């Protein structure tokens, strides 16, 4: 198993003066992304369906459900009125809430919610905030997709996987349109990342199967076909990739999908 990495101290001024919006930025990968931009000197705005226990200093939190059009409107209106727009937009909100049981267990409501949460939220917010980016002549947009868009798990997360596939495809088309106008668009597709939600899933698997936690973890990794690196990724690793793509260190990185999965996807 590859040892856990040590994360370098970022340049405290790398994102100074930048306005950054991270959706779903209070837990897991989103929380790590927000923290990474804050450590680089950015003004960070986050939004989620429920307010965190403590809003960090220098950070604006907007309580809104981005799976709804009205929730997107709340976020966009607040950001535009208070900040005049953003320089960096990271769409991280999303997840799976579908029941197990395969395709036959999925209702229209399950499919609609998955697409509203994982796909339409990004499309709607882009539509609301890109005009201000076009007006200022620059911007960076990063959509957080998933390797499930290429490696769908049909038992319980098929709607999520399909919505992420749509998000990745949409991102490519958007990049072709807005790239010539100064806005870079990229997609980051994580694999199995260690978060509090992932830890909870491992605990549930261990309890339901009557096995120890390590066996549950190994079983979960094997359900993905194994992770050649030998461990789940860390949220901070995803955050570092996002920060790099959004920074001036990556001026020609545009219209791409960047997979961070420890080698889970074995094909080129």
Language model: regions and residue ranges:
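A conserved structural motif in NAD(P)-dependent oxidoreductases
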Residues: 215, 226-238
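Conserved glycine-rich cofactor-binding loop
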Residues: 19, 26-27
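Substrate-binding pocket helix/loop in short-chain dehydrogenase/reductase
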Residues: 99-103, 107-115, 141, 223
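Short C-terminal tail/terminal secondary-structure segment
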Residues: 2-11, 100, 231, 242-243, ...
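Alpha-helical segment proximal to the catalytic Tyr-Lys
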Residues: 131, 176-177, 251
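Catalytic loop of short-chain dehydrogenase/reductase
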Residues: 142-166, 171-180, 192-193
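Short, small/polar-rich loop/turn modules that mediate ligand/substrate recognition or access, typified
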Residues: 179, 184, 253-255
């Amino acid at each position: 198993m590859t040892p856990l990495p040590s994360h370098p101290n970022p340049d405290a001024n790398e994102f100074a003066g930048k306005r950054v919006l991270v959706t779903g930025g209070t837990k897991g990968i989103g929380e790590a992304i927000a923290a990474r931009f804050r450590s680089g000197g950015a003004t960070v705005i986050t939004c989620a369906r429920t307010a965190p226990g403590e809003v960090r200093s220098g950070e604006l939190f907007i309580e809104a459900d981005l799976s709804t059009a009205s929730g997107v409107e709340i976020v966009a209106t607040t950001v535009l009125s208070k900040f005049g727009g953003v320089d960096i937009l990271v769409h991280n909100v999303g997840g799976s809430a579908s029941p197990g049981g395969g395709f036959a267990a999925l209702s229209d409501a399950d499919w609609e919610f998955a697409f509203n949460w994982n796909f339409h939220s990004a499309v709607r917010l882009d539509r609301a905030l890109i005009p201000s980016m076009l007006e200022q002549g620059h911007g960076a947009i990063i959509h957080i997709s998933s390797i499930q868009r290429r490696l769908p798990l049909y038992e319980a997360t098929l709607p999520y996987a399909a919505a992420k596939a749509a998000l990745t495809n949409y991102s490519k088309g958007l990049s072709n349109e807005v790239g010539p106008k100064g806005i870079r668009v990229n997609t980051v597709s994580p694999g199995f990342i260690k978060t509090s939600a992932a830890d909870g899933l491992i605990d549930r698997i261990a309890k339901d199967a009557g096995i120890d936690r390590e066996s549950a973890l190994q079983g979960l990794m094997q359900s993905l076909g194994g992770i050649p690196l030998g461990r789940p990724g860390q949220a901070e690793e995803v955050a570092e990739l996002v920060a790099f793509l959004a920074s001036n260190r990556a001026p020609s990185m545009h219209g791409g999908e960047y997979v961070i999965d420890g080698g889970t996807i074995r094909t080129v």
